């Protein structure tokens, strides 16, 4: 947390500024000898200045660290630098000293660092000639430091710089010894290794041992050299975009390193084999490795005196100061060293660990190094400064300075991140660094952050969102925190992440909504980067900033974007077009922030890690609020957030408000955050779809393709459940992340946060796509990946359970009850998109085949999909989903009939593919644009929603089969409108909690104002349903209306609300019950899932529209939006698959709504399900009228539904299931394990109607029909109250699938 403070101090810090203000002002004279000229770097530990040595009149590097910082790294730097004097490749030490205010080291000034030089190359790579010759020099420097008994432990490109003088410009110097450690004892023997050592170094280049927190040895420095050289030659590493230490460690451990050699000289196999054979005690054969370089050069005829690549370019790279070097300080220790905010390095005080053992005699005392003071020159500036005696140590000043610079840059953020990173490395819940909210988001400067453990990246996202509420700087720093969603997505312990829960106030800030949305994006793209405050990231900010501008900035004010100028030491690993990155980021960022951090974290750093971390627990995180965040049994290790969160903001689901998403829904106390998280999930699918459409956007064409295609494919196929559960948190930042990655890697300690970003970047990275393609595939976008993950989950279970399976298993059980599904959970949340719904109608078919859509809905549980900025989110995702859904409507008939039809990988894929290709792509583009627009306006918040809502919207629009009808127009004329539609649907699903509450809410929502209202409250209600806080949702919704203008289509809020409120009451219980019951329900859930998957999907479509507008439509039982969806979901739920198919076949045909009105009325009382998110108010009012009649028209509704959707009986049956759901929400509540999910499911079912409702003409009637159908069940619902509860409990257990299945059981 203190780490965060560092970033908070000054956003400029990110750019390399000081932790706070620069420690030294310009023209300040240190020790009467060194006059500060300018700051050239800054890190977590301190700052690096270019200074003029008044004695020698030469420019030197001055590294300064505050004397107040807990981590004092300069001591180690001085100790090692002094020991290395006289060695080649080591800066000349000039002096050191300290005073009351700061410690400093003066050394020779060097030129540009290698990370900067590589990034400056056209392709981001060095030729083999340059790579091999640099390799030789770096190897010599490594051998030199080892020869004096020290390990560098942070070997990376930014810690090596070329000389800047004519005599040294071709020599490579080793910098930054702050992380060094003495591996020998006083007798020169190798010290015994510690059992557990804190992680040191930079994630990207760290050895597997370092990732495992094992004692690092000499071979670990060589592993880092190996990774460096591969990166030099290839331009990137497979894990380049992944910032999460745990994930990268898992990838490295499993990765076939020989794959890295395909572009390297054949001799490198000897290098790899040798270092792989070494252990801690074994001395490396430096000569063997040197011979590898030399032989490779001979083979290629490379001369030692050839020009280096940057020399050929005619650049004066070498002559520029080592400012770029600062990124080196991104290493973890540097962060710790910076000591900003009492950050302690990862397990074990790095500084202490390094210096206490070895440097007992080392002091920065002026006397020790006192150089001749210029006579007559009184010490200027430093009050105590006078006694800073420059140490005319001599030749090493440069190294010190450079390291200092790097560290300083890094340390700025590092201060805050190190502790978090440490926690993360320890596997302890790491406070998710909140996404730094865009400046526009009004956040209290520094809200007391409640760090709660977040099980999933999404939860982190929520936390990020919450953080976003905190000041931008804070947000940034938090984002930087390893706990940040992106981090979480990457981290192997997503569930354990701590989510920062800034107070309710943060969440409530209405302005936050847009800010949150943007923040989320920023968090997604920047959050991981916020660590960028660290040197590397800071410098890299130029690159990732560009991306940020595209994705994040457009979403939120320029100020929001952290100007992390960590030295772009290594972050801009890939020189990919920034715009693509930006767009990708947009897509990804918008998705999770987790995606910043997360929505499903989305931010998943790597597919691999995700698979590794398929722990459902993370998904549950999102419900930190009082939902059963911990509901997810899979994340028992991490503290259940539910309790924690419930206190601070019971309604806010950690998952829902992942990071920025929560922020987005600031207005809705908890839901705003939810909205953000939702946005994350939505973005994910959207990104994937979009990626399908535009591979160019994906940095890693392969990976992206895998993700995009994989996403839909996964959604359809759902082969990897575990992956899906993995956190999608880091997804958002892939594009940016490349650069960021490099920087972040350099800021290891703080970088862990960045690691997530890097992970995200990696996801986009082609390398990742190739090497980690499968693993990363699901994580193509941070959000996307998360969604995919969820989708995968749902895909895996697709045939049987869209998301239910994975959700159920991974976190479905616990999470289902929790509405707080994270983006990852989103897939689990797919439950919200009732499979039954998907099955029911064409929409159902669409949904089923569109696991993505389902995933979106699932990913962003309705609560998660709070549609505060639903329309924004929806816009982006909805198009994608809706197009998919639209395309899929036909399959839905069969799918619904089959129950798995849509879900079936083959069928689903086919359906999805077609939609993706045409409607989906079209919609995706439209949605993307609107999504981006929305995102820019309130996009971040909507992004999470987008994920979930997008899916729903897709359902909504697609189910109608006329995306253009409602969905396309909405995105076109009003990105928000489309999003709103989608969002509303989703929200209505999520929001339809308590029947009583819903009606009023629905009424409000139904009003012209309704869409916005629905949107606003939707997040809350969505969250509520999950949390079983229907009541809360209602208020939230009302509060949110202003912030949630995006959905114009009235949503069936009542549906969701009804489920939600009862859910709300039982949220905790259900959560826990769910956890207890997850396995029990698994079998049933599987069956129900299969049957209900379509329902769920349909429901998700409807749900999305319901969510936002459900409240208003709830009353009105929007016949419009949910007509198709509702009928589809209703029939699916109630009817056998055949019936569903029949219903689906007819579901597209609009039916008269007049008869339904009475039913709606009844329905509202019985169970307001926000039947539809009617595109127009007219429909809404119509629905409202119907709603009052609710139950009475139940029969009518059934026949209509039968006619439109399929057999009357099927409709009636569906209605029944739907009705049971509404009561079921409460029932669901009773059934703790599945209450939330069931709520979601219920809402989703009802959402189905909203989905259709979104469809203009047909949907209304259908929605009405469905709604009526539900009202029919409404009486039953009341009757089913108990039974419904049971069913709902089951559904909750099935996580929405259960809902669908329950509906089916009811029907059956």
UniProtKB/Swiss-Prot annotation:
One of its GO terms (biological process) is peptidyl-serine phosphorylation. Pfam families: Pkinase. One of its GO terms (molecular function) is protein tyrosine kinase activity. Gene3D superfamilies: Transferase(Phosphotransferase) domain 1. Residues 735-769 have a biased composition (Acidic residues). The modification Phosphoserine is found at residues 441, 541. The active site is at residue 154. GO terms for cellular component: cytosol; microtubule associated complex; neuronal cell body; nucleoplasm; perinuclear region of cytoplasm. It comes from the Eukaryota. PROSITE patterns: PROTEIN_KINASE_ATP, PROTEIN_KINASE_DOM. Residues 485-496, 868-885, 1020-1035 have a biased composition (Polar residues). Its main location: cytoplasm. Belongs to the protein kinase superfamily. CK1 Ser/Thr protein kinase family. Serine/threonine kinase which is able to phosphorylate TAU on serine, threonine and tyrosine residues. Induces aggregation of TAU. This is Tau-tubulin kinase 1. It comes from Mus musculus (Mouse). The gene is Ttbk1.
